[in-house]
Amino acid sequence: MAEVTFELFGETSEGKEVQECTLKAGEYTAKVLTFGGTLRSFMVPAKEGIRDIVLGCDSVEKYEEQSRTNYFGATVGRVANRITQASFELNGKIYTLVANNQGVNCLHGGINGFNRAVWEAREENGALVLTHTSPD
């Protein structure tokens, strides 16, 4: 079972608090941000000692900047991968989305996907639980 702790990491440009959630189990430590449900760091034992195997940023501002084009460690959605031509048909109706990939496709939920949401976090029985309600 992991030890779970919470610490303020910073604020978004909209003034929302972002928590850094730390899970520690033995020699392993994972750090997850509530911004984007993002895995920021994962420390693991290696020959050279404990090493971080995640490419992460040092501030909420940097995560906000890169989250428009990169998805380092983030939870993506509503859709994972590309929706070609940023549109799809469902039950005979065509839905047009914002093209955020190469100017023609919708990638990983678009410009305001799950990777840009501030998630709720709580500890439950030694586990980290992140939740986010995506409005229709």
Model-derived features: where do they sit?
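Surface-exposed acidic/polar loop and edge beta-strand patches at domain peripheries
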Residues: 1-136
